Amino acid sequence: MLDRVETIACGFMSIGIKPKDLVGIMAETSPLWTQVDLALCCLGSVSVTIFPSLSIKETSFILNDSLCRYLIVGNEDILDRIMKGYRNIPSLEKIIVLDFNYQSKDDRIIGLNEILELGKKNRFDKYAEYLSYRDSIKNEDWYTVVYTSGSSGMPRGIVLTHFSIASRMTGAFEFWSRYGMSISEKDVSLCYLPLAYIFDRASCQFVSIFSGACIAYADSPGTILDDIRK
C-alpha cells in the first residue's frame, strides 16, 4: 500500500502536481480512490471530492469554484461527460483516468498506468522532494474540500484540514473504546459509502489503515448484506 501510494505521488509530481494544488476526484468507491487520495494527502495537495453521479453543470461549477487544475476520473464514461464541458472549465489542465489500460493521444488526458510508470521512473529523483512535502504538512493545512449536495442551491465547498481528519479518527477510536470495541490487523472493515463523503474516509478508511486492518469494498450500498457474507 505504502509503495503504491508513494509511486502514485511521484507520478503526480512528474505531471506538475504540487503542494496546495486542488485536485478533483470524481470516481466510484474503490481501492484506487483511496490510493490517489492518500497520494495527494502525502504531497500536501488538496482533494476536491465530486460525486460521479453529478451532471456536467454541477461538476463544472465545483471545478470552477475550487479552481481545480487537475481532475481524476474513475472511467471513460465520466471522462466523456467532462470532455463535453471542458471548454467551460478554464482552470482545468489535465485529467487522470483511473484505468490501467487507458491510453490517450490527447495531451490533456493521462491514464493511471502512465502515472505509475512515471512514478517508478522518477522516484529516485523525486523521492527526497516528496518526503520534504510530506514532512512539512501542518495541522492547519487543507486536506480536502467537500461540497454539499446542492439541494438548496448550488453546492458549497467545505474545507477540512489535516487536524480535522486526525480529530475525526481520534473520535472514532474513543467511541469504540467506550463500548469495549477495537480494531486491529486481524479485522476487516467494509467500505460501502461513497468516498466523496468524509465520514467513510476518516472513520473507516484512515482508521483501518492506521490500525493495519484490511478494507473490503462493497459493490454498492444495495449489496451490503451479500458483501458482508462474502
What are these regions (language model features)?
Residues 15, 42-118:
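Structural core segment of the AMP-binding/adenylate-forming
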Residues 97, 117-147, 154, 180-188:
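Conserved pre-ATP/AMP-binding loop-to-beta segment of ANL
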Residues 10, 22, 28-56, 64-70, ...:
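A short helix-loop-beta submotif of the ANL/AMP-binding
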Residues 32, 54-57, 78, 174, ...:
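Short acidic loop-to-helix transition motifs that present clustered carboxylates
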Residues 1-38, 55-60, 111-119, 160:
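Conserved AMP-binding/adenylate-forming core of the ANL superfamily
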Residues 23, 40, 71, 142, ...:
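Conserved S/T- and glycine-rich ATP-binding loop of Class I adenylate-forming
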Residues 166-191, 195-230:
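Conserved AMP-binding/adenylation subdomain of ANL enzymes
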